[in-house]
Amino acid sequence: MRRYFIYLGYNGKNFRGWQIQPNGMTVQQSIEEALAILMRTPVPIVGAGRTDAGVHAHLMIAHFDWEEPIGDLVFLAEKLNRLLPKDIAVYKIVPVVPEAHARFDATSRTYKYYVTTKKDPFNHELVYKLPGRLDFEAMNEACKVLFDYIDFTSFSKLHTDVKTNNCHIQHAGWTQEGDIWVFTIRADRFLRNMVRAIVGTLLEVGRGRLTIDGFRNVIEAKDRCKAGTSVPGHALFLVDVTYPEELFPVED
């Protein structure tokens, strides 16, 4: 059995998230249906994460298995793209070692969230528009607090089936790109709804409704009700997933 990683991106506007579910089309379902047509048999895939409804991915990685070596992976990617809807794109397909796992072997995942205080008719579907001014300097100070903790229960969706709420934050901060402010966060793993809850709470700091110490208290409370409201998913992007080099065989 051979295993392959699919590198892909998608606009999540028209999908009910990544994972297959009964109440609407998902990205995973779209790809599996296209693979089934090409391979003439069901081909399940496993993604690096489970983005929520409306959330996008500049880069998502998923794995699938096939009994024999696939000769022309470039051609397979091209055929997949012909079958997939316009809001999903396969970038490439690469062979990996048989035990490689798109979800469990990922060493980091990076998300970006886009915020603006100015109205723009061209990016309103991909950026979160907020009225008034925000103190991004204070928000960046609050970001530093994230590195002092690993238990992020306060930013986790309630009643999930995860075994632990521990995550190791590797990077977190706000940068400005013209009229848009971008929150970038990288960690070994993320909880369900975690990034949107963190951004929502940081915005409370930016509005002056929550102090830096108050932000720390939210984390220490380990209570989702203490954190801010989750921001909408339409401005959230998964932008990178990393893996150990040993998962990728060296070509002769």
Curated annotation (Swiss-Prot):
GO function term, MF aspect, one: RNA binding
Pfam families on file: PseudoU_synth_1 (PF01416)
Any one Gene Ontology BP term: tRNA pseudouridine synthesis
Alphabetic keyword roster: Isomerase, tRNA processing
UniProt keyword Amino-acid biosynthesis present: no
The EC number(s) this enzyme carries: 5.4.99.12
EC category: isomerase
Claim: tRNA processing is one of the keywords in the record: yes
Subunit (UniProt): Homodimer.
Similarity field: Belongs to the tRNA pseudouridine synthase TruA family.
Entry-linked PANTHER family: PSEUDOURIDYLATE SYNTHASE (PTHR11142), TRNA PSEUDOURIDINE SYNTHASE-LIKE 1 (PTHR11142:SF0)
Protein name: tRNA pseudouridine synthase A
